[in-house]
């Protein structure tokens, strides 16, 4: 207590510390590095968890988008819609070159990067790096602005489902080090830095899987399959459902499921799907991410593949947004990524 008073005292002359913190809580995250230069006490305040607790209390938290692309390797950028600009995080200090096929989620105000393997190729032999799947876990603390290694997963995995359920991270399925598909699942408690086993998936498939949370339940989807494996609670385990969902990238916006299929964006309404917008302009994109930020669907990065007239592959830094809450949703361009471009390897929303 004495240390905090000493380092954060005198934030604003003549104003109590608690009031000064409430003033600082309204300053956007992208301006924090500038505020740190004012004084030691301001730096201590900006890098305190107390400030972010006050931000949450005052409902001044920001919704940000965290993105990692193939180029440059192991670099994450963060997009702020409030100022329409991108910030670059410090390099992920993983020993693995070109980390890919990992899981990425946010919880407890931090970004977590889990598992995955190397997508690096030797320029001499053309061979891939030997690391296919790892158990490593990293977290990025936006208060301290640093990466920290966390407790390793119980099983190395890549191309797996990764979600947050009630503040805890759930990973399931994917492939392990011998490139064998696995049904195992586990849960991570970020507060205690502990992994525990949870019931296995009922089915394994020789394809990559992904996960999303719909109506408070984890849904694991395997590419090319109509069946979905659903987890509502660890005690109940997994259920296998066949919802007949359209094939294509999916995202949840304000508890509503959206899917991009056959050049169109559809919205789930009960047992039916309503078309909300055309997405034909994205048909040629490969490796893009479809994600959500506040009340918008975002299309991020990717590459334009070769065609009959042009054999070049063009990596993109473009970002397009669709405000689905409007009566007439329309696409608009937002600030492109300033460092990242090409195939999107990780993409997740952060509230802080």
UniProtKB/Swiss-Prot annotation:
Domain F-box: 9-55
KW Repeat (keyword) present: yes
SMART domains cross-referenced by the UniProt entry: FBOX, Kelch
Kelch repeat copies, ranges: 57-109, 110-167, 168-215, 243-293, 296-351
Known role: Component of SCF(ASK-cullin-F-box) E3 ubiquitin ligase complexes, which may mediate the ubiquitination and subsequent proteasomal degradation of target proteins.
Domain notes: The F-box is necessary for the interaction with ASK proteins.
The protein's name in its UniProt record: F-box/kelch-repeat protein SKIP30
Organism: Arabidopsis thaliana (Mouse-ear cress)
Organismal lineage: Eukaryota, Viridiplantae, Streptophyta, Embryophyta, Tracheophyta
């Amino acid at each position: 207590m004495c240390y905090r008073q000493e380092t954060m005292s005198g934030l604003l002359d003549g104003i109590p510390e608690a009031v000064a913190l409430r003033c600082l809580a309204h300053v956007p995250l992208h301006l924090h590095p500038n505020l740190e230069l004012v004084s030691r006490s301001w730096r201590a305040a900006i890098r305190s968890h107390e400030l972010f607790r006050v931000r949450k209390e005052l409902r001044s938290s920001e919704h940000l988008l965290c993105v990692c692309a193939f180029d440059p390797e192991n670099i994450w950028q963060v997009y702020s819609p409030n100022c329409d600009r991108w910030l670059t995080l410090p390099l992920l200090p993983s020993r693995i070159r070109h980390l890919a096929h990992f899981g990425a989620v946010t919880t407890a105000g931090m970004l977590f990067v889990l598992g995955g393997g190397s997508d690096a190729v030797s320029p001499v032999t053309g061979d891939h790096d030997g690391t296919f799947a790892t158990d490593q876990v990293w977290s990025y603390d936006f208060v301290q602005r640093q990466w920290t290694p966390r407790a390793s997963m119980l099983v190395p995995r890549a191309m797996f489902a990764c979600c947050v359920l009630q503040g805890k991270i759930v990973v399931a399925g994917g492939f392990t080090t011998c490139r064998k598909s696995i049904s195992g699942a586990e849960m991570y408690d970020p507060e205690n830095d502990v992994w525990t086993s949870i019931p296995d998936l009922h089915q394994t498939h020789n394809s990559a899987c992904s996960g999303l949370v719909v109506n408070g339940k984890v849904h694991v989807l395997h590419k090319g399959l109509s069946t979905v494996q659903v987890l509502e609670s660890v005690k109940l385990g997994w259920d296998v459902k066949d919802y007949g969902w359209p094939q294509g990238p999916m995202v949840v916006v304000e508890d509503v499921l959206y899917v991009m299929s056959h050049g169109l964006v559809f919205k789930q309404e009960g047992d039916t799907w309503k078309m909300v917008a055309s997405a034909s302009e994205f048909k040629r994109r490969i490796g893009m991410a479809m994600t959500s930020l506040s009340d918008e669907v975002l299309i991020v990065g990717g590459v334009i593949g070769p065609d009959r007239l042009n054999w070049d592959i063009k990596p993109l830094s473009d970002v397009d947004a669709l405000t689905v809450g409007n009566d007439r949703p329309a696409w608009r361009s937002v600030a492109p990524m300033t460092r990242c471009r090409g195939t999107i390897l990780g993409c997740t929303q952060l509230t802080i």
